């Protein structure tokens, strides 16, 4: 009875917070937004700012084929990044300039005024959320054109597309973007660039491994409830070691978390620690196991054999398992039936069955 009462109170509180948030936004919009929507001109576009400052690594990975296509079609491309997802593009040759989105309001305003001097022909915003400060930021940039999705009530976005493909893969949204810019010849394969020195370090690591098959496991995700449990991880590693004792097992992810796993003596922890070293380790691997969509997308970039572990979540109306699915012909996606369930609730024997399938397929 008490649980139901608290659940009801939380629901009321959420609705109240949402109401006041919308009220604050609508009041601010009166002063910040344009009074009318300008006409969208695609023919004169030469310089583009792509907003990818949400700090989500997976979103940045999915954006990389668009960066490549825009550059190859002659556009000058600048990218606004977060500090956490910049690692994906730090060696990307198709981006002419990078900027970082700051945390403090004062610095956000200063950056907006700085970007105004770039005189952008187009700003691309692939995001769903639009806080008041971000509305002001885009207004300050004062680009000729601003492209967005589901921003029909905001006049700054003079090219708005209503998007309600709640079960379509995220790449479908990018295809719509490309069509509206007038680009039809492009490849949506994810495009991650690893510097030569990191490639050489990982090559040396693999050269010292005893086995011919390498399985890469990423135990952790951005949210704790999406982590592989201790019991699952021990079960997976033990099963692989017994089934194929010669298989190399490498763990990738945040070193501070990986170093808290003293029970994994049969594994190699990525000794380099960086995101791009994990990318290169995955590129050379035979099988990847991960609950984290960013690592699943890295594996997809190289069409690696993948066991992708998903809960059953919704982000608004969007079905996460479909929108952020592997998009990889060599991936098997294991999804919980119960909504908002934990990865730890996926039965171990279901995971082991797929490991058996891939190891038999590799057959070395």
Language-model features: locations:
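Conserved nucleotide-sugar phosphate-binding/catalytic loop shared by glycosyltransferases and other
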Residues: 2-10, 76-108, 266-267, 329-336
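Short amphipathic alpha-helix
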Residues: 60-70, 84-85, 236
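Short internal beta-strands
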Residues: 76-83, 148, 250-253
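Donor-binding and catalytic core of enzymes assembling or modifying cell-surface/extracellular glycoconjugates
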Residues: 109, 230-312
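Conserved nucleotide-diphosphate donor binding/catalytic pocket of glycan-assembly enzymes
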Residues: 2-10, 99-191, 218-219, 223, ...
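Positively charged, low-complexity intrinsically disordered leader regions
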Residues: 2-45
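Active-site donor-nucleotide binding/catalytic segment of nucleotide-sugar enzymes
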Residues: 47-53, 193, 197-258, 312-314
């Amino acid at each position: 009875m008490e649980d139901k009462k608290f659940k009801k109170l939380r629901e009321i509180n959420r609705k109240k917070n949402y109401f006041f948030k919308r009220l604050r936004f609508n009041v601010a919009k009166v002063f910040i937004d344009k009074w009318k929507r300008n006409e969208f001109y695609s023919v004169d576009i030469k310089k583009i700012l792509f907003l990818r400052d949400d700090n989500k690594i997976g979103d940045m990975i999915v954006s990389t084929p668009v960066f490549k296509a825009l550059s190859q079609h002659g556009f000058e491309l600048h990218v606004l990044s977060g500090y956490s997802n910049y690692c994906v593009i730090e060696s990307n040759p198709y981006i002419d300039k990078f900027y970082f989105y700051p945390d403090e309001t004062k610095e956000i305003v200063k950056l907006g005024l700085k970007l105004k001097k770039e005189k952008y022909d187009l700003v691309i915003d692939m995001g769903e959320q639009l806080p008041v400060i971000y509305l002001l930021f885009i207004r300050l940039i004062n680009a000729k054109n601003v492209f967005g999705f589901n921003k029909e009530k905001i006049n700054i976005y003079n090219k708005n597309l209503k998007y309600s493909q709640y079960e379509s893969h995220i790449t479908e949204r990018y295809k719509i973007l490309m069509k509206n810019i007038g680009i039809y010849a492009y490849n949506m394969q994810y495009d991650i660039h690893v510097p030569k020195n990191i490639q050489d370090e990982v090559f040396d690591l693999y050269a010292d491994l005893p086995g011919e098959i390498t399985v890469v496991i990423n135990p952790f995700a951005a949210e704790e409830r999406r982590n592989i449990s201790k019991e699952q991880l021990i079960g997976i590693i033990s099963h692989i070691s017994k089934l194929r004792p010669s298989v190399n097992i490498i763990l990738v992810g945040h070193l501070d978390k990986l170093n808290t796993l003293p029970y994994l003596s049969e594994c190699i922890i990525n000794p380099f620690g960086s995101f791009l070293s994990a990318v290169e380790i995955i590129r050379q691997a035979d099988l990847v196991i991960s609950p984290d969509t960013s690592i699943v997308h890295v594996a997809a970039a190289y069409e690696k054999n993948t066991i992708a572990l998903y809960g059953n979540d919704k982000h608004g109306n969007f079905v996460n398992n479909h929108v952020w699915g592997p998009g990889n012909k060599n991936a098997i996606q294991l999804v919980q039936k119960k909504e908002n369930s934990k990865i730890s609730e996926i039965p171990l024997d279901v995971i082991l069955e797929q490991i058996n399938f891939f190891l038999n397929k590799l057959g070395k």
